[in-house]
Amino acid sequence: GLVEAHRASGAACTLLAGTSDVALPYGRVLRRPDGSFDRVVEERDCTDEQRAIRELNVGIYCFESRLLVPALGRLTCDNAQHEYYLTDVPAILRDDFGGKIEIYTADLGEQIIGVNTPEQLELTERYLRERGE
C-alpha cells in the first residue's frame, strides 16, 4: 500500500492520487512531461484546462518527518482562498529541499469521498444510506 511504497522509495513525500471519470472537487495532480510530479493545484485554483485533468489528489500523504516542519514554514497563502495549502508541501520539498516526490496511484472508486460543501455532504450521506451504512 501507500506506506510501504513510501518507505521503499526513499521519497521526501508520497501522495495518494486516483483517477475519476466524474468531476470531483479535489485538487489536480499535475505532472511534468517525463511523468514525474510537478505540483498539486486545488480545484478552486484550477484553470479550465487543469480542471479537465482526471488524476486527483486525495489529500493523503506520507512525509519524511524531518523535512515536513521546515517545509511547512515555507508555505504561503497566495491562492484563491487565501489559505495555507498542505498540497503545496510536496513541491516545496522538491524545489527547496531537493526531495524526491512519488505519486502512489490507486483506484478511487467510491472508497474516498471528499466533503467540503453541504451539497457534497448530502451526496455522501445518500451514498452511505444506499450502501446500508
Regions found by a protein language model. Name each.
Residues 1-34, 58, 62-65, 70-75:
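Conserved beta-loop-beta/alpha segment of the NTase-like Rossmann-fold superfamily
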